[in-house]
UniProtKB/Swiss-Prot annotation:
EC number: 1.15.1.1
Keywords of the record: Manganese, Metal-binding, Oxidoreductase
Assembly mode: Homodimer.
Species classification: Bacteria, Pseudomonadati, Chlamydiota, Chlamydiia, Chlamydiales
Cysteine-cysteine disulfides: none
Function recorded in the entry: Destroys superoxide anion radicals which are normally produced within the cells and which are toxic to biological systems.
Gene it is expressed from: sodA
Coiled-coil boundaries: none
Keyword Nucleotide-binding: no
GO molecular function: manganese ion binding; superoxide dismutase activity
Keyword Metal-binding attached: yes
Reactions accelerated catalytically: 2 superoxide + 2 H(+) = H2O2 + O2
Protein name: Superoxide dismutase [Mn]
Binding residue positions for Mn(2+): H30, H78, D166, H170
PANTHER family recorded: SUPEROXIDE DISMUTASE 2 (PTHR11404), SUPEROXIDE DISMUTASE [MN], MITOCHONDRIAL (PTHR11404:SF6)
């Protein structure tokens, strides 16, 4: 086996740190079970891919694409998701500053209006998926966009993800039941804008 298997990243906070917005029960299941399953399935697909490449089995290589896209996307999306959240008493919900705030105000007028639009995009996801704040390097602009299932933003659109809102039911159902909007309205309280600003600065400086 020539590939290095992926592993579950540690959370930068305790499982109960995002309460009352997200319960510890949800966080444990979401991280230890759901994210881990994506990683397990991704590694299994990569092992098959490694064998298929060795055997030059083109049919198998093509057949593996859906599993790589779904489980690889699940790992990419969740790894970013954990990093862009923070407990309320550790800066969660504190608005961004500097260039990122200026760009948000340029495209959406105010921070409050941006959050309203973000919630609208997330609420509009049919079934399971993600709502994203992304940066388009080609146009040097911020965008709000949804992706279905576990489709990752960057490989499919060329836009770089800054913030992702998980609107799969496993992200909220145990606490909010079928009222997705209550989850979305509470979500801005735990956005880690400090981390997102750092990520944005790294993107800008590398282009």
């Amino acid at each position: 086996m020539s590939f290095v298997p992926y592993s579950l990243p540690e959370l930068p906070y305790d499982y109960d740190a995002l309460e009352p917005v997200i319960s510890s029960e949800i966080m444990i299941l979401h991280h230890q079970k759901h994210h881990q399953i994506y990683i397990n399935n991704l590694n299994a697909a990569l092992k098959r891919l490694d064998a298929a490449e060795t055997q030059q089995n083109l049919n198998e290589l093509i057949a593996l694409e859906p599993a790589l896209r779904f489980n690889g996307g699940g790992h990419i999306n969740h790894s970013l998701f954990w990093e862009t959240l923070a407990p309320i008493d550790q800066g969660g919900g504190q608005p961004p500053k500097h260039e990122l705030l200026s760009l948000i105000e340029r495209f959406w007028g105010t921070m409050d209006n941006f959050l309203k639009k973000l919630i609208e995009v997330a609420a509009g996801v049919q079934g399971s998926g993600w709502a994203w704040l992304g940066f388009c390097p080609a146009k040097q602009e911020l965008v709000l966009q949804a992706t279905a299932n576990q489709d990752p933003l960057e490989p499919l659109t060329g836009k770089l993800p800054l913030l992702g809102v998980d609107v799969w039911e496993h992200a909220y159902y145990l606490q909010y039941k079928n009222v997705r909007m209550d989850y979305l309205k509470a979500f801005p309280q735990i956005i880690n804008w400090g981390h997102i600003e750092n990520r944005f600065s790294e993107i800008i400086s590398s282009k």
